[in-house]
């Protein structure tokens, strides 16, 4: 077995993210082998198709096996992409919102680590045996921003991590999180997409998929009717304005300091957050893998004796 491989995983409500991949959190279980091996995880004698749709809301992601199975799929994807051995020792780096970090750290680490024994499974028809030798947990959002040191020169800056279900807020003072400023708002992109879907259904009688709506938000031309596209962007603009108002109401003055927006929602809302002239100074980090990259970077710093995050 080779040296320990560090793999960062961002366990989102809507999507799982690693340094090189992002895939939906949907998980469909089958008793028998599906017709295709694409995105199929075989574990414990059962088959799971990974990435079909999204998970129902789980406020505690450790209450079911779903996110553990999604973690195995994420590890397999990274090992294959990196050309690493499929029998590997893993240092898993993950994150939690700062608002619940102290409360949930122990249970999350136990959930991912288990007993540290070898885990045999198959992914997309290939055999894997991984041993999770260590789990390190870090504050999400903060870990992502640390990858962008040039953005941290301001004495105070707001960080808004727009996820699927929540928007996690914090203020950094001289690069250090101000714990009293941390908030978690249930205003994530799932709500935005659902509101858009309902408005399109009401005006046009159409049931659009999440994939269609997200494609339009990214600016894809496609073959969509321009009237529908206009409604999508109008609703997204309303959502962005409401989000900025909620940030201000939570005690973070977006008129007084820069605001860094990151996460999957920031990538989708880039044009709308950038268009809020006079409301804030937005800095958009649209790389959805920034948290995962930040986790791996922090593990590297730990190994050199800089900081800690267990």
Residue ranges and their predicted role:
Residues 1-159, 176-191, 203, 211-310:
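Nucleotide/phosphate-binding catalytic cleft detector across ATP-hydrolyzing
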């Amino acid at each position: 077995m080779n040296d320990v491989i560090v793999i960062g995983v961002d366990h989102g409500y809507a999507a799982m993210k690693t340094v090189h991949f992002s895939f939906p959190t949907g998980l469909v279980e089958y008793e028998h082998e599906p017709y295709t091996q694409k995105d199929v995880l075989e574990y414990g004698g059962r088959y799971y198709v990974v990435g079909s749709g999204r998970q129902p809301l789980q406020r505690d992601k450790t209450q079911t096996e779903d996110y553990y199975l999604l973690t195995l799929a994420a590890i397999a994807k990274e090992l294959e992409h990196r050309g690493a051995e499929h029998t590997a020792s893993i240092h898993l780096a993950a994150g939690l919102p700062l608002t619940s970090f102290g409360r949930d750290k122990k249970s999350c680490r136990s959930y991912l680590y288990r007993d540290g024994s070898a885990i045999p499974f198959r992914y997309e028809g290939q055999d894997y045996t991984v041993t999770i030798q260590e789990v390190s947990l870090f504050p999400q959002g903060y870990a992502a921003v640390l990858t962008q040191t040039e953005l941290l020169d301001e004495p105070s800056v707001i960080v808004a991590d727009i996820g699927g279900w929540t928007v996690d807020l914090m203020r950094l003072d001289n690069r250090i999180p101000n714990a009293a400023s941390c908030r978690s708002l249930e205003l994530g992109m799932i709500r935005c997409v659902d509101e858009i879907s309902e408005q399109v259904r009401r005006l046009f009688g159409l049931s659009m998929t999440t994939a269609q709506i997200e494609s339009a938000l990214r600016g894809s031309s496609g073959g969509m009717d321009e009237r529908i596209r206009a409604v999508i962007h109008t609703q997204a603009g309303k959502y962005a304005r409401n989000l900025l108002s909620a940030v201000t109401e939570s005690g973070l003055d977006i008129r007084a300091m820069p605001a860094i927006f990151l996460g999957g929602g920031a990538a989708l809302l880039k044009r709308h957050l950038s268009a809020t002239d006079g409301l804030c100074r937005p800095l958009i980090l649209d790389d959805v893998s920034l948290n995962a990259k930040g986790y791996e970077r922090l593990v590297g710093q730990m190994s050199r004796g800089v900081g800690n995050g267990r």
